[in-house]
């Protein structure tokens, strides 16, 4: 399925961009109007990696979702726009999104 519109975030409602590779998952909150990354985390971060046995599971994605939500809420940002990239909203992508929602982010 091809998306024709590009997703853009603002300072009030930045973009939560998710990238999934075969081994890791990355999440970052981006303000597209200034081109700045506000917060980011991945399964490569020391605090996240220490909690995991395997970085390519849905459980790892849930932990990344919880961590990105905590970091974003610490910056007083409650609403984001979810950007899954070209990936289908399934598996590790949906696990990260649901964990971020349960931790308090709104999208």
From Swiss-Prot:
UniProt key word Lipid metabolism: no
CDD domains: Ribosomal_L18_L5e
Keyword match Iron-sulfur: no
Gene Ontology annotations for the cellular component aspect, listed alphabetically: chloroplast; ribonucleoprotein complex; ribosome
Keywords recorded for this protein, A-Z: Chloroplast, Plastid, Ribonucleoprotein, Ribosomal protein, RNA-binding, rRNA-binding
Subcellular location: Plastid, Chloroplast
Pfam family, one: Ribosomal_L18p
Annotated transmembrane regions: none
GO MF term set: 5S rRNA binding; structural constituent of ribosome
GO biological process, one term: translation
HAMAP family in alphabetical order: Ribosomal_uL18_B
Task performed by this protein: Binds 5S rRNA, forms part of the central protuberance of the 50S subunit.
Subunit relationships: Part of the 50S ribosomal subunit; contacts the 5S rRNA.
Recorded family membership: Belongs to the universal ribosomal protein uL18 family.
Name of the protein in question: Large ribosomal subunit protein uL18c
Name of encoding gene: rpl18
């Amino acid at each position: 399925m091809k998306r024709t519109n590009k997703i853009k975030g603002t300072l009030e409602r930045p973009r939560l961009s998710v990238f999934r590779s075969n081994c890791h998952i990355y999440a970052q909150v981006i303000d597209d109007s200034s081109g700045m990354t506000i917060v980011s985390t991945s399964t490569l971060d020391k605090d996240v990696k220490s909690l995991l046995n395997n970085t390519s599971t849905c459980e790892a994605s849930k932990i990344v979702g919880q961590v990105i939500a905590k970091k974003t809420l610490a910056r007083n940002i409650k609403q984001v726009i979810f950007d899954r990239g070209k990936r289908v909203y399934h598996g590790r992508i949906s696990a990260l999104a649901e964990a971020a929602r349960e931790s308090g982010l709104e999208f």
